[in-house]
């Protein structure tokens, strides 16, 4: 299973040799992780990870969704249910189930990330199987007890320069404060994710808004609600935040008058908002967040187009983030126009657009980002954060948006040990793509070196103000 040094490079010898040279120039660059979902408590408390299953299987919905698709219950993977039904607590049994079904992950990015971690973090080069499951479990478990496997030591070992968590608007950020107070050199910063207090279609929307204004000490009015967001954004900024993140069902924006927006707020805060009112409120809030970003400088990320909790049975029994979120078709040209009419020409605003609809890359997103000063294209996201997905992204966007209307790479993960693996993959695919341009005489090699460095490091650092 030993990692091939030419993985993800072209099979054509000349192009492969160019890719090798390019990759050698960026392989050791620091990791900028400007958007992700690791837990701040890991860095604050710096405690050992409990066991291999808790590290690799239970928190990784890429893993659990594949196993669930093959008929393995989430309970058998140690996922706790809301209704109190028993779930597997024996980490070794969970690991054995994972190992027995490792063949399911052939040709998936999950396999690339896992095997990279096995070799580079644990020194294990055997391919996981039913036969060696216990031996590999024991080897990992033994290392997890060692000081060099604690979160802070891994941060240094992975050569991470900065990492952003994703945090609710009302989060007190106590673990970020603990990291700062500890004097540790690691840069762990929050990102402002206000979805729970913005999505009027959620059953808990009203209570989340009440919580927001309560924490901020503002009245439960439209203006008080906006002031609460401003208050919390400043709270996040004081702890190092440089970005906000917005995971909406669509990319719809609106630019209502102050009176219409206030009346809309009064309707939705009473609960039981109509579908159209909920969508209009989300749309208005994207524009309001853009307005706030111009004032406070937070980079704005929009992650639209996921049909969340598509499987109601799984959602009712297990809750959010259990692998049942599905990409859906997403429009940008018409839906973003109200926001762009208001702020799209303002260079003080940076809006990073992501999509789960690859058909929008060349038709909508690249032309939009290739024109509006306020827009940038986020990297291939979620289902397309893969070798083929990243390559499709480059091919579909570069001819219209170029490289410099993109923002480098986001690992966007909950799986801590996959962070260096994901950046390794992205750097290799980008170098392979650039090598092809050099081999086709569309780019000089000295230019390719510069672009490779920018894609691996500089663009993320610059765009996210890190």
Swiss-Prot record:
One of its GO terms (molecular function) is glucuronate isomerase activity. Keywords: Isomerase. InterPro entries: Metal_Hydrolase, Uronate_isomerase. Pfam families: UxaC. It catalyses: D-glucuronate = D-fructuronate; aldehydo-D-galacturonate = keto-D-tagaturonate. Pathway: Carbohydrate metabolism; pentose and glucuronate interconversion. GO terms for biological process: D-galacturonate catabolic process; D-glucuronate catabolic process. It is an enzyme of class 5 (isomerase). The keyword Isomerase applies. Its EC number is 5.3.1.12. NCBIfam families: PRK02925.1. Belongs to the metallo-dependent hydrolases superfamily. Uronate isomerase family. This is Uronate isomerase.
């Amino acid at each position: 299973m030993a990692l091939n040094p030419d993985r993800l490079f072209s099979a054509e010898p000349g192009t492969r040799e160019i890719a090798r040279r390019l990759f050698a120039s960026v392989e050791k660059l620091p990791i900028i992780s400007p958007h992700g979902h690791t837990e701040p408590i890991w860095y604050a408390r710096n405690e050992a990870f409990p066991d291999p299953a808790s590290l690799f299987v239970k928190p990784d919905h890429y893993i659990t969704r594949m196993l669930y698709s093959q008929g393995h219950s989430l309970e058998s993977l140690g996922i706790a249910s809301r209704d109190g039904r028993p779930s597997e607590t024996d980490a070794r049994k969970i690991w054995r189930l994972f190992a027995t079904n490792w063949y399911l992950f052939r040709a998936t990015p999950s396999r690339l990330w896992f095997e990279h971690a096995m070799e580079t973090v644990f020194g294990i080069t055997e391919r996981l199987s039913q036969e060696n499951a216990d031996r590999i479990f024991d080897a990992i478990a033994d290392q997890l007890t060692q000081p060099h496997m604690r979160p802070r030591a891994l941060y240094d070992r992975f050569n991470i320069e900065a990492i952003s968590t994703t945090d609710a608007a009302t989060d007190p950020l106590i673990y970020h404060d603990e990291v700062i107070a500890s004097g540790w050199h690691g840069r762990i910063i929050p990102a402002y994710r206000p979805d729970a207090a913005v999505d009027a279609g959620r059953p808990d929307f009203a209570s989340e808004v009440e919580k927001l204004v309560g924490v901020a000490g503002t009245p439960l009015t439209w203006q008080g609600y906006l002031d609460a967001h401003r208050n919390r954004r400043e709270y996040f900024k004081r702890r190092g935040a440089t970005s906000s993140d917005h995971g909406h069902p669509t990319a719809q924006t609106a630019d209502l008058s102050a009176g219409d927006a206030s009346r809309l707020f009064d309707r939705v805060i009473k609960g039981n908002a109509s579908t159209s009112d909920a969508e209009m409120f989300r749309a208005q809030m994207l524009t309001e967040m853009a307005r706030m970003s111009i004032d406070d400088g937070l980079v704005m990320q929009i992650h639209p187009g996921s049909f969340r909790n598509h499987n109601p049975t799984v959602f009712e029994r297990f809750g959010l983030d259990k692998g049942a979120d599905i990409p859906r078709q997403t429009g940008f040209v018409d839906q973003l126009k109200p926001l762009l009419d208001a702020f799209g020409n303002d260079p003080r605003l940076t809006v990073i657009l992501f999509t789960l609809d690859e058909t929008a890359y060349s038709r909508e997103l690249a032309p939009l980002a290739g024109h509006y000063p306020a827009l940038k294209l986020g990297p291939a996201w979620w289902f397309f954060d893969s070798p083929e997905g990243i390559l499709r992204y480059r091919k579909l966007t570069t001819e219209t948006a170029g490289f410099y209307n993109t923002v480098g790479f986001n690992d966007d993960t909950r799986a801590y040990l996959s962070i260096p693996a994901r950046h390794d993959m992205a750097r290799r695919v980008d170098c392979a793509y650039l090598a092809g341009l050099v081999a086709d005489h569309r780019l000089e090699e000295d230019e390719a070196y510069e672009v490779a460095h920018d894609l691996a490091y500089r663009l993320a650092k610059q765009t996210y103000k890190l």
